[in-house]
Amino acid sequence: IPELNDEVQATKGFNVIATANNRDRGVNELSSALKRRFNTVILPVPETADEEVEIVQTRVASLGRALELPAEAPAIEEIRRVVTIFRELRDGKTADGKTKLKSPSGTLSPAEAISVMNSGLALAAHFGDGILRANDIASGLVGAVIKDPVQDKVVWQEYLETVVKERKDWKDVYRAAREVL
């Protein structure tokens, strides 16, 4: 510890666990010497939307209980909509494959979907009536998608206008997301 002019030895069994997303790059790559000192495990994005929805639903329920959020568990349809948005933007096309989309610079991982849902639940619980609605998740969605305020904002606006606006049951998501912008 240079600041204390001291040295501390790790106890037996000490491990460092680091995480990163494939699309998140720092200024410099890790050196090959450092990479050799890590066991690397790559977790792929879930193959199906149903699998991803199940992961998000399970974690959101678990975290909601741990955080003692008084909000109702989110309707599966709200989770499905967030997962659909993330998958379509990640994949660069709509779920039906009919519309090609630009992808934002962020990863839009299941972990981010979990974060969007938990944030929405907290807003619904503490500032709403406890029922998760599109306006509760809109700011989280926008924050997850728009990492680069120039490039990603264009991607998100195009997605809203060409995909979300046209979906019959998604008018509330469209309105809420437009209000946040």
Regions inferred by a protein language model and the residue ranges of each:
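Signal for well-folded cores of large energy- and translation-related assemblies
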Residues: 24-27, 35, 39, 87-90, ...
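Residues that form generic nucleotide/phosphate-binding pockets
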Residues: 37, 55, 59, 81, ...
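Generic alpha-helix detector with strongest preference for long hydrophobic helices that associate
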Residues: 11, 15, 19, 36-37, ...
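Conserved AAA+ ATPase small/helical "lid" subdomain
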Residues: 53, 60-136
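C-terminal engagement/docking regions of AAA+ P-loop ATPases
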Residues: 125-181
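Acidic-enriched, low-complexity/disordered segments with a strong bias for Aspartate over Glutamate
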Residues: 6, 24, 50, 91, ...
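Canonical AAA+ ATPase core
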Residues: 1-67, 121-123
